[in-house]
Amino acid sequence: MKKGLFVVLVLVLVVAFAASAIYLAAYFTDSAKSQMADNDRADKVSQMRQEYTESQTTQATETTEPQATAGADPTETSFNPYGTPGVSGYEDEYFTPDELEPENIPERPVLQSGSDLLPWYQELHDENPDMIGWLEIQDSKINYPVMQTSLDNPNYYLYRDFDKNESYRGCIYAREECDVFKPSDNITLFGHNMKDGSMFAYLGNYYNKSTWEENPLIFFDTLTESHVYKIFAVFKTSGTDGVGFAYHLMADAENEEEFNQFVATCKELAFYDTGITPVYGDKLLCLSTCEYTIDNGRFVVAAVRIT
């Protein structure tokens, strides 16, 4: 009897081990395949963006040169990869001198047409009209399209890739409550905390202030505008209704008091002080992923738009 029970237990363990091995193999295979596809899209976007930048530079140099002023470089164009300041205009507060050094400014063209699609996103949007933008954090794997669907299925891309195939990784996505084009006062983007370091896994590095000091900027483009955000708070909270901070439910503040309370809560929960406090009228971005030190935890990186 004991021997028979032992055999049964061994068989159960073998089956459980085999099932786990199959799951992990499928998990990492799917992740690797999806990451390769995302890398191809990122490379395509980068190439088209670079070609656009070069064409704009060429057009600028081919036009009639303006009269040179004392101390000015007559070949210099007015091209500004950062666009215009945010509502509060705190460039001195939001940017450090090092971040404003030319070698630290990425070649990211700005086309704020308000209606025309940025040309480097046109092809991808034609492939999947659910694409609403592009998210990038430099020196990380975060370089992905951002998706959005209707209210009847707001989490559609939680476990679907860009091509709408089932995927453990899913896509980076915004729920329908957020309007990225208006934009809403706060836009929350969701992504998985993948074991292979892809999707939003990198966000966990912001638990350490040194990561924020070295890499505080987030680049989030809509289909029509390019924008830069700077992280002002990093925190964790419970995702259970009625327990944690419901940051994801705030899209448009009813008034200045509600906006300020939202910012204050983000900063109260923050692991460290960044010295940045957004003001009413600024536009915010929250990146949300799973956090495993608390039950149903969420790890959130909150940023304010600076261009």
What do these predicted regions represent?
Residues 1-16:
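N-terminal Sec-pathway targeting helices
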